[in-house]
Design a protein with these regions (language model features):
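Jelly-roll (double-stranded beta-helix
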Residues: 4-8, 29-31, 104-107, 130, ...
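N-terminal regulatory/effector-sensing and dimerization cores
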Residues: 3-104
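Short, Lys/Arg-enriched, Trp-marked, Pro/Gly-tolerant hinge/linker segments that flank
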Residues: 102-117, 121-186, 199-211
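Basic/polar phosphate-binding segments, predominantly the helix-turn-helix DNA-binding elements
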Residues: 170, 175-212, 231-260
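Flexible coil/turn residues that form the inter-helical turn or adjacent wing/linker of helix-turn-helix
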Residues: 175, 223-225
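Short, amphipathic alpha-helical "recognition" segments used to contact nucleic acids or chromatin
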Residues: 218
């Protein structure tokens, strides 16, 4: 008999710009990955090691994690020691429009302040209607006023020289792009392009593109698309290919994600 998933996902039509992940006593580990959304999380029990550009950092129960879109990271528990956490994903375009900014950055990606933890705890709860969605939006403004700063560009790192390749990748991650073609877009050799790309984003071009495709499939699944449709739309060879990649990056199958379990 299959064990129930420790992961739950909460989405509501009143807040289409937000999604909540609630993971209880999860032993699962993640590969380095990134999200298209802002990620705001709190550890409820246990501890995790937060791998990111300025890490790794241990985060204990009550600790808060803040992650910008496109920032590579992974949060993994100690071996044999499950942890519980909640993570709120907020659509970047919606948030930028609401706050009137091009992008946001978090000067500190981990916080242990009790007031901040209490605020994030209140934000990381399921939305059940319009009133709750309005409270969530106002709470986000309050949190970001304290913890975020406006940024000029939403591109990760010193990526100006890589902008042509990044634009191509984001415009069509499902297309048959090669390292050579992306390097030519930036006027670089393939070797130099890979080195510069990894220094700016924390990932190889191939890993970055795979993340974009997985995130694209995730968005489609959240709107009710069939697994086969999401796999085809994002350029995966078949459903099994998407399932393997999705589970490695999100610690659950795309089917479980679509069902919210």
């Amino acid at each position: 008999m299959t064990s129930p998933s420790p992961h739950r996902f909460h989405r509501h039509p009143a807040a289409p710009w937000a999604e909540l992940r609630d993971s209880a006593r999860s032993p699962h580990c993640f590969r380095l990955h990134m999200h298209a959304e802002y990620s705001i999380g709190i550890v409820d029990a246990g501890r995790t090691v937060f791998h990111h550009a300025h890490g790794p950092q241990p985060v204990e129960a009550g600790g808060v994690v803040l992650i910008e879109p496109g920032a590579w990271h992974a949060c993994n528990p100690d071996p044999g020691a499950p942890w519980s956490y909640r993570m709120l994903f907020v659509d970047a375009d919606w948030l930028h429009a609401r706050l009137g900014v091009a992008a946001l950055r978090f000067p500190r990606r981990t916080l242990t302040d009790a007031d901040i933890a209490s605020l994030v705890d209140g934000l990381c709860r399921p939305v059940d209607g319009t009133a709750a969605a309005d409270r969530l939006a106002l709470g986000l403004e309050h949190l970001l006023d304290r913890c975020a700063q406006p940024a000029a560009l939403p591109l990760p790192g010193d990526a100006a020289a890589l902008a042509p390749a990044l634009q191509r990748l984001h415009a069509g991650p499902d297309a048959g792009l090669t390292v050579q073609s992306l390097a030519q877009e930036c006027g670089m050799s393939a070797t130099r392009f890979i080195r510069r790309f990894k220094a700016a984003t924390g990932m190889t071009p191939g890993s970055y593109r795979l993340n974009l495709r997985i995130n694209g499939a995730r968005r489609l699944l959240a709107t009710g698309a069939a697994l086969s449709e999401a796999a085809y739309a994002m350029g995966f060879a078949d459903q099994a290919h998407l399932q393997r990649a999705f589970k490695a990056h999100h610690a659950l199958t795309p089917g479980c994600y679509a069902r919210g379990a």
